[in-house]
Amino acid sequence: MPLKKRSASAPRKTPQEVPRLLISGGVEVLGLKTGPDSITEVEAFLNPRMGLENTDNHYGYSENVTVAKKKDDDKPLKNQLPCYSVAKIELPMLNEDLTNDTILMWECISVKTEVVGINTLVNTHSYGKRDGESPSMPIVGLNYHFFAVGGEPIEMQYIVQNFQCDYPVGVVAMKPSPLSTQVLDPKQKSKLTGDGIFPIECWAPDPSKNENARYFATYTGGLNTPPVLNITNTVTTILLNENGVGPLCKGDQLHIAAADICGFHIEEDNKYKYRGLPRYFKLVLRKRVVKNPYPVSTLLNTLFTQMSPNVQGQDMTKQVEEVKIYEGTEKLPGDPDMIRFRNQFGQEETVIPVITN
């Protein structure tokens, strides 16, 4: 039987073109670094910062929540304010020479994360509020779950329920807060740079920024809402954006943040404490070739600036009267009273004396 010739197939369509990403997170992206050592994994956990220190028997809880009697007399204590947990992870250094046109940067591409300790919420025999001979009340109430991964500190927006609230010393809050902080005031922003000092009720991730970070959050309200939590080690959250680029770790540093309020623990006297749980992270990073974002002049200036200790002293910008620097020798000037000096730009200037009658 003679073989049939293949019919000429229709020409294939050209693949659809997509925008070529040039800059992400303030860094010009070039390509990926392949090889057996181009992927690394990092495991970390963040403990909750509910208010009480790790030396207190109620570590992981807040102090009993008190309620203001008037709107303009709202003064919560620091140990009653759950705050964000923050950490900075130092990654292996990738570049020995930072003067090249291109360098390597770590790019975080995925994360596995879960709240650790939801099993503790089934405890109904420890001391707490109870009705007659019934078990003590389990943890109930509002739930707030948040985590973030970034190549630099997470950008936050300040927004509050009561602008007249007088927040205590030791937390990051606006003093005094303008009325505009009860809605979105684009002037009130900050970076999440401290552990246990940014109150959750005051700071939210800034949706207009955070191009070099990824954040996720859920909230369920109510005083008696039963917490609903899931855990698994089979779910991976991809951190790549629509252009296939994840957070780029500037300075070989990875920033993570978390906040996990699981409800209230109700005391026998009807006092309420916030209950928080820790969060586990497993992060996967790969090497990305990028255009060098660090000018050599900036690197050298930073090097010499950091070599000297940081001294907080009196302002000397208008106090230095005269600085003399000698170099080599010269012929004796004919006018010893003539003032010669170099200005702040290194240029030589001569002040010709003016004779007044």
Swiss-Prot record:
<keyword id="KW-0597">Phosphoprotein</keyword>
<dbReference type="GO" id="GO:0075509">
    <property type="term" value="P:endocytosis involved in viral entry into host cell"/>
</dbReference>
<dbReference type="GO" id="GO:0019062">
    <property type="term" value="P:virion attachment to host cell"/>
</dbReference>
<comment type="similarity">
    <text>Belongs to the polyomaviruses coat protein VP1 family.</text>
</comment>
<dbReference type="Pfam" id="PF00718">
    <property type="entry name" value="Polyoma_coat"/>
</dbReference>
<keyword id="KW-1145">T=7 icosahedral capsid protein</keyword>
<keyword id="KW-0945">Host-virus interaction</keyword>
<keyword id="KW-1162">Viral penetration into host cytoplasm</keyword>
<keyword id="KW-1048">Host nucleus</keyword>
<dbReference type="InterPro" id="IPR036931">
    <property type="entry name" value="Polyomavir_VP1_sf"/>
</dbReference>
<keyword id="KW-1161">Viral attachment to host cell</keyword>
<keyword id="KW-1015">Disulfide bond</keyword>
<dbReference type="InterPro" id="IPR011222">
    <property type="entry name" value="dsDNA_vir_gr_I_capsid"/>
</dbReference>
<protein>
    <recommendedName>
        <fullName>Major capsid protein VP1</fullName>
    </recommendedName>
</protein>
<dbReference type="GO" id="GO:0039620">
    <property type="term" value="C:T=7 icosahedral viral capsid"/>
</dbReference>
<keyword id="KW-0426">Late protein</keyword>
<keyword id="KW-1164">Virus endocytosis by host</keyword>
<keyword id="KW-1160">Virus entry into host cell</keyword>
<dbReference type="InterPro" id="IPR000662">
    <property type="entry name" value="Capsid_VP1_Polyomavir"/>
</dbReference>
<dbReference type="GO" id="GO:0005198">
    <property type="term" value="F:structural molecule activity"/>
</dbReference>
<comment type="function">
    <text>Forms an icosahedral capsid with a T=7 symmetry and a 40 nm diameter. The capsid is composed of 72 pentamers linked to each other by disulfide bonds and associated with VP2 or VP3 proteins. Interacts with sialic acids on the cell surface to provide virion attachment to target cell. Once attached, the virion is internalized by endocytosis and traffics to the endoplasmic reticulum. Inside the endoplasmic reticulum, the protein folding machinery isomerizes VP1 interpentamer disulfide bonds, thereby triggering initial uncoating.</text>
</comment>
<feature type="modified residue" description="Phosphothreonine; by host">
    <location>
        <position position="329"/>
    </location>
</feature>
<keyword id="KW-0946">Virion</keyword>
<feature type="short sequence motif" description="Bipartite nuclear localization signal">
    <location>
        <begin position="4"/>
        <end position="13"/>
    </location>
</feature>
<dbReference type="GO" id="GO:0042025">
    <property type="term" value="C:host cell nucleus"/>
</dbReference>
<keyword id="KW-0167">Capsid protein</keyword>
<feature type="region of interest" description="C-terminal arm">
    <location>
        <begin position="296"/>
        <end position="357"/>
    </location>
</feature>
<comment type="subunit">
    <text>Homomultimer; disulfide-linked. The virus capsid is composed of 72 icosahedral units, each one composed of five disulfide-linked copies of VP1. Interacts with minor capsid proteins VP2 and VP3.</text>
</comment>
